[in-house]
């Protein structure tokens, strides 16, 4: 379900600085991409509510940023209850959390829009100062990292600021927030694509498909 509370979801008329301001962003999973989402959202004026199974997860974040609250619980069902109770506006879930898990199921029934870090990064990119800088995306079962690094090297050899991001390098949302890029070479796993809805790359490649990661 998608909540319209507090002006969410945004329209394309929202500016780069206004997209997250005064809204609540819920983050499930404080891994590398989850921490990046929390930092970017909080620094852009959002209230951040984060959830993680590990005790102490996000402690540094909540100390660094006043508008970040963190709920932790090693019991998946108890943490799922916290998500259902406290999640608001927009929810960004870790790509490592499977759709069959209690946490994903709790997030999916909360009165929020659930998206990936990649999707949020695209929405920021689309209204930001680098909106004209293309994304070149690569997915597939095998060879993604090698190919995306080759792509970034080709672009950089032409003098472009074109980092490899996504499932390799820095989280995409961090790079979009920092800005200054001419193009992005983006590695996307199937997990990252699962809740990615509106990304429009200039070009994309699916390298291959094979039976892998079937326990997700």
Regions found by a protein language model. Name each.
Residues 5-6, 197:
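Generic N-terminal simple sequence motifs
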Residues 6-116, 120:
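N-terminal leader/targeting and accessory segments in enzymes
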Residues 42, 80-84, 95, 99-216:
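Phosphate-binding loop of NTP-binding sites
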């Amino acid at each position: 379900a998608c909540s319209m509370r507090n002006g969410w979801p945004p329209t394309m008329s929202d500016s780069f600085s206004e997209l997250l301001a005064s809204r609540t962003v819920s983050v499930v999973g404080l891994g590398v991409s989850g921490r990046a989402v929390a930092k970017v959202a909080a620094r852009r004026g959002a209230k951040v509510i984060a959830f993680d199974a590990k005790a102490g997860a996000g402690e540094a974040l909540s100390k660094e940023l006043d508008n970040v609250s963190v709920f932790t619980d090693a019991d998946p069902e108890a943490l799922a209850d916290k998500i259902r109770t406290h999640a608001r506006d927009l929810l960004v879930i870790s790509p490592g959390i499977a759709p069959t898990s209690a946490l994903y199921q709790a997030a999916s029934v909360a009165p929020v829009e659930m998206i990936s870090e990649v999707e949020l990064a695209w929405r920021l990119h689309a209204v930001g100062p680098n909106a004209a800088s293309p994304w070149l995306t690569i997915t597939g079962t095998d060879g993604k990292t090698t190919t995306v690094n080759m792509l970034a090297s080709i672009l950089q050899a032409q003098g472009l600021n074109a980092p490899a991001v996504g499932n390799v390098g820095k989280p995409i949302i961090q790079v979009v927030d920092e800005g200054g890029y001419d193009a992005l070479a983006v590695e996307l796993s199937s997990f990252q694509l699962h809740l990615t809805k509106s990304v429009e790359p200039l070009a994309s490649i699916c390298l291959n498909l094979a039976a892998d990661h079937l326990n997700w």
